[in-house]
A protein has these predicted regions:
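Extracytoplasmic soluble-region selector
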Residues: 1-86
Length: 86
């Protein structure tokens, strides 16, 4: 199994290969929202708590191209991450 591409809170760009999973590190995974400018290139999954563990938001690299992920924190501040998929 290939490990996910980890995107830290200070990164504004990331590279991934088709099929890679993305793990977006945030302070508050459950209350942070992530959107993708192109869900056909990078799909996103929101952070969650399943009762036994808390998971960061993440995504999946679906096809070659570029998508901008917008991370909206609980205080409504945002940051963007440009993900290039090859």
């Amino acid at each position: 199994m290939v490990p996910p591409v980890i995107i830290t809170e200070t990164e504004t760009a990331a590279a991934a290969k088709v099929g890679d999973s993305l793990d977006i590190v945030v302070t508050d995974p459950v209350n942070t929202k992530v959107t993708s400018s192109d869900e056909t290139v990078v799909s996103v999954e929101q952070g969650r708590n399943d009762g036994s563990a808390t998971f960061n938001p993440g995504g999946k690299a679906l096809k070659s191209g570029t998508a901008t992920l917008t991370v909206t924190n609980p205080d409504n501040t945002t940051r963007t991450i440009e993900v290039t998929v090859s």
